[in-house]
Amino acid sequence: MEGDELTQNIEQWKIKRLIDNLDKARGNGTSLISLIIPPREQLPIINKMITEEYGKSSNIKSRIVRQAVQSALTSTKERLKLYNNRLPANGLILYCGEVINEEGVCEKKYTIDFQPYRAINTTLYICDNKFHTQPLKDLLVMDDKFGFIIIDGNGALFGTLQGNTREVLHKFSVDLPKKHRRGGQSALRFSRLRMESRNNYLRKVAEQSVVQFISNDKVNVAGLIIAGSAEFKNVLVQSDLFDQRLAAKVLKIVDVAYGGENGFTQAIELSADTLSNIKFIREKKVMSKFFEEVAQDTKKYCYGVEDTMRSLIMGAIEVILLFENLNFTRYVLKNPTTGAEKTLYLTPEQEENHDNFMENGEELEALEKGPLPEWIVDNYMKFGAGLEFITDRSQEGAQFVRGFGGLGAFLRYQVDMAHLNAGEEELDEEWDDDFM
């Protein structure tokens, strides 16, 4: 993956995680501030607005809510001062306020400000009991969207592929008359009826294409793939019935062995060369390569949190495969008596088990604690590794998450994981003996 693309993928991943956290947050009254400023705005005007809002907040009757709102407005104004009245090139996103728990007690104070990885066109200022994240979500769906029309003698399907997400928009079946074997006038009449049915079918497909892929008189996809198992796909594209605005967007016509959703899947795969930058295709290719390494037992792969992190730290990893929603926490723990440190990677269930934080009857001190995926994203380059994000929205990605734990890697050289693990167990036993 090229540097710019990987940087954008990392920024998108960070925004997804931020959205998850912000959507869960709740504040007291209208104490949570969502402020989004596009690059065309003037920062002094925004500062003046915040000052005026502070003055108005003195009218809030509830003392607790008033203090929370004023605290958030003060923090917002202080943060804006850091930009010296000059907005970043892509605009500014800011969230600020005190988040409360179910008992109404302040749990955490958010002050988050950053420049989005691409220019944002939305202007937003809202004080509410929740953060408003829709503009962030809109940033994530700005990948090119491609349309698919799957057409054969049994029916048609209309779908889209955007990033990792494919969607069936509409589908319908058709019962076309077969060729008539009799001769004479009967054959001519049936032939005429058959051609009329085919033309009506093509007209319906052409009309539905406009419904699905044209909005406000503009084509709403970056390109079209037409697929099918018979001549219908070629006839459709060449037909005067097919809207010329859509015809101009046809990127490729592909032969598929199936109709319907199976044909949709095959069409995505067969148009891979045309849609090479679509993440869905990339994910399938990366995962297919990984599964091939596993099947051939090349020993140039690893999977699972423990083996992958061990391989990363020893510098053996070429590319890390990271499930975007991997739910592990990284701990660095210290034995207060011996001073020995160790690193653990725990699931939420394992974090509930207090035994994981005990050693020889002593409670271990937590030196570091944080989400494992964030640590990987912040540190993978220090070990000379690359990074690929994996979703569970493709069949291969879902298999990787279910069967391989959502974390794996391609290795630079062969590593015998079984031998490596056995060696570490022997070292652990020797370490234990030293302190028995």
Curated annotation (Swiss-Prot):
UniProt cross-references to Gene3D superfamilies, sorted A to Z: 3.30.1330.30, eRF1 domain 1, eRF1 domain 2
Primary location group: cytoplasm
Cited SUPFAM superfamilies: L30e-like (SSF55315), N-terminal domain of eukaryotic peptide chain release factor subunit 1, ERF1 (SSF55481), Translational machinery components (SSF53137)
Cited InterPro entries: eFR1_2_sf, eRF1_1_Pelota, eRF1_1_sf, eRF1_2, eRF1_3, Peptide_chain-rel_eRF1/aRF1, Ribosomal_eL30-like_sf
GO molecular function: translation release factor activity
Entries under SMART domains matching the protein: eRF1_1 (SM01194)
Annotated compartments: Cytoplasm
UniProt superkingdom: Eukaryota
GO cellular component, one term: cytoplasm
Keyword match DNA-binding: no
Role this protein plays: Directs the termination of nascent peptide synthesis (translation) in response to the termination codons UAA and UAG. In B.musculus UGA codes for tryptophan.
Similarity field: Belongs to the eukaryotic release factor 1 family.
Subunit structure: Heterodimer of two subunits, one of which binds GTP.
Protein name: Eukaryotic peptide chain release factor subunit 1
Gene that encodes the chain: eRF1
